[in-house]
Amino acid sequence: MLKFMADNPQVQQRLRTALREAWPAALAEQRIPTVNEIHGTVIPFLDATVEESLRCAGTLPNTVRDAIRDTTLLGHFVPKGTTVFLTLYGPGILVPPFPETIADDTEKVADWDPEDMHVFKPERWLVPSSTAPGGLEFSVNAGPSMPFSLGLRSCFGKRMAYYQLRTVLALVVWRFVLEKCPEELSTSQAVDGVTHRPKHSYVKLSTAY
């Protein structure tokens, strides 16, 4: 998440501006925002940045499910009882994506332009709204992504993870400017285990004020 901020300074500055507009009292008093301020204020671009970080970085390499009935997935027949390995990291940034002709007609999420699926672009999670300030609101269903899986067996720590990610990102971007590290310390290489972890976890900071 912090690596994406360093690699995309325009996104980082847009987020910092959104945070300062959301917490004018904290800015005027030159202090960090409180937990109540962080989680009691609707900031669509903050939520969008967290979600885009999860989409691009990935949390798990895959998950496993057993088919409880005969079905067809992307044109392939899957008989009941089959163990299905679902790749969580890849489909959301795949270029080109799976052909639309084999996709399910009952999709519950929107679709994105396949040409920029590999680009870190938080605004893809913002949708028009007639009631939200600025005319945009965050939507978790804006596109295809499931970093914590779905259904009854989805990650039970999902809510805590979002709480922590929102807190950490807000506080770091509020207080610091994340600058790009040297290439050898800022690769996208990762190690897969229980979770998908970056191989290099270095940051370069300067004060934001």
Label for each model-derived stretch:
Residues 1-6, 168:
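Short, small-residue alpha-helix embedded
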Residues 7-59, 74, 80-82:
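Cytochrome P450 I-helix active-site segment
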Residues 9-13, 150-154, 158-196:
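Cytochrome P450 heme-binding "Cys pocket" and the immediately downstream C-terminal segment
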Residues 44-51, 142-146, 163-170:
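A structural signal for well-ordered alpha-helical segments within the folded catalytic domains
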Residues 53, 78-81, 120, 151, ...:
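Hydrophobic, well-ordered secondary-structure elements that form the walls
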Residues 87-135:
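Conserved cytochrome P450 K-helix/beta-meander segment immediately N-terminal to the heme-binding cysteine loop
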Residues 133-147:
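Active-site-adjacent bridging/hinge elements
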Residues 196-209:
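C-terminal helix/juxtamembrane-tail motif
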